[in-house]
Regions:
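Entry/N-cap segments of selected transmembrane alpha helices
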Residues: 5-20, 78-109, 116, 182-204, ...
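Hydrophobic transmembrane alpha-helices of secondary-active transporters
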Residues: 36-43, 59-85, 170, 174, ...
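Alpha-helical transmembrane segments and their lipid-water interface positions
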Residues: 35-38, 47, 66-70, 100-108, ...
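Short helical (or helix-break) motifs at transmembrane helix termini and adjacent helical loops
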Residues: 66, 73-77, 99-104, 125-166
């Protein structure tokens, strides 16, 4: 039955992802590597153990996993820390994001001669850093200190820059590919949705604080926090925008008005299976054919 297929598929993704970490641990590789490799191996291009309808039906995991990661990074944006490291973090973020984007655009457009629209979008994507893999690797190694705090702040701000850059780039690329005149309102609308997400996240941070009195039991704290994060993800899905910025601002507001780091620790205990499924699913979606076959990539240039 369909129910049996769903349950067995999720069980396989979880257990095989765990087994692969036993191998990567011997090689001193992060668990994220194990999860992605597992997804590739059990995916449609190798063993084909997971039906395509399961892969398509778990698309929501991406938003939920990113929401957990973004909320947890908010813990590192205490106002006292921002005052101390703010200028340094901003300079590092802008330099690495802008230089990466410029380099990718030069290579894609002037060297590989890909079309302008695709080159612009790829350049904007180069500005972003994957927060999930960074946070999971830090958790796995137990790393702490000023460097880790600065790294997480840079990764978080980097995604702010990346999302804004992508919002602009995708609008410019659509205009370029369609040959129509530039519509400034499309750019403003995309940026506006991200700003709205930030504002809503701040509001949800205050709501979360109001719903978390000190007498609230541990179980109910977890239930309430999950319901708020899931609700916010749903609103972002309706607005067709990423929950990343909003959940980041939610976590930032919550930690600064409550100084309650216990909630973040609770969510850290709950999130590993979701993050494992997210990365395994990323591997399942990986198109091995596009690495060497130019006809499956954009233009005629293979990804490899």
């Amino acid at each position: 039955s369909d129910i049996a297929i769903i349950i067995i598929s999720i069980a396989l993704m979880l257990f095989l992802g765990f087994l692969m970490t036993r191998i990567t641990k011997k090689l001193r590789l992060p668990n994220v590597t194990a999860y992605i490799v597992t997804g590739i191996l059990i995916g449609p291009y190798v063993l084909n153990l997971i039906p395509q309808k399961i892969i398509d039906g778990t698309a929501f995991l991406s938003d939920i996993a990113l929401a957990f990661i973004a909320f947890s990074t908010g813990e590192f944006f205490r106002f006292s820390t921002i005052k101390k490291n703010g200028p340094k973090v901003v300079i590092i973020t802008l330099l690495e994001a802008l230089l990466a984007s410029i380099l990718v655009f030069v290579v894609m457009y002037f060297i590989l001669h890909l079309n302008l629209a695709f080159s612009i979008v790829l350049a904007s994507l180069a500005a972003a850093t994957a927060p999930a893999s960074t946070v999971m690797t830090i958790r796995q190694t137990g790393a702490k200190g000023d460097f880790v705090d600065t790294l997480l702040q840079v990764v978080a701000l980097d995604d702010v820059v990346g999302l804004i850059a992508y919002s602009i780039a995708i609008s410019v690329a659509m205009v370029s590919s369609s040959g129509t005149s530039s519509n400034f309102m499309d750019v403003v609308k995309n940026i506006g949705f991200n700003v709205l997400s930030l504002a809503l996240g701040c509001g949800f941070g205050f709501v979360l604080k109001w719903l978390m009195p000190k007498k609230r039991s541990t179980d109910n704290r977890l239930i309430v926090s999950l319901s708020i994060i899931f609700l916010f993800c749903g609103i972002c899905a309706v607005l067709d925008t990423s929950p990343l910025l909003g959940c980041m601002s939610m976590g930032t507001i919550y930690i600064n008005i409550t100084n309650d780091d216990k909630l973040f620790k609770q969510l850290n205990y709950f999130s590993p299976p979701i993050l494992l499924l997210f990365f395994v699913r990323s591997g399942l979606n990986f198109d091995l054919g596009s690495l060497t076959n130019g006809s499956e990539a954009v233009g005629t240039t293979p990804l490899l």
